[in-house]
Regions:
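Short, surface-exposed, charged amphipathic helix/loop patches that serve as local interaction elements
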Residues: 17-93
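Short, isolated positions in well-ordered beta-strands
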Residues: 11-14
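Short acidic-hydrophobic surface loop/beta-edge motif
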Residues: 1-9
């Protein structure tokens, strides 16, 4: 497990094996290539559940972002936070 904190102060503990999971890349590509917002949203939800282990943990992550940003969890902010977390996993290895 990799523990850390993002620049905005969100604490995380993630399984470092996620970086080797082919589903991660699949879902990132699926999000990027989505032709409709609903497709991108569905892929994002699947990605969050994969990274955090379940829907409840993923939702708690989004709630924490919203609490730091006037009650809104903006997609760009969430992606920035996720990128920092995944970069921390890469840096460990």
């Amino acid at each position: 497990m990799v523990k850390g904190k993002t620049k905005s102060g969100i604490a995380f503990e993630l399984d470092e094996r996620i970086k080797d999971d082919a589903r991660l890349m699949y879902l990132l590509v699926k999000m990027q290539n989505a032709t409709a917002p609903i497709e991108a949203g569905r892929a994002m939800n699947q990605l969050l559940a994969l990274i955090f282990g379940d829907d409840d943990a993923a939702y708690a992550f989004m709630e924490e972002i919203a609490s730091k940003h006037n009650g809104v969890c903006e997609s760009e902010v969430m992606i920035t936070e996720l990128t920092e977390m995944l970069d921390a996993i890469k840096a460990k290895n």
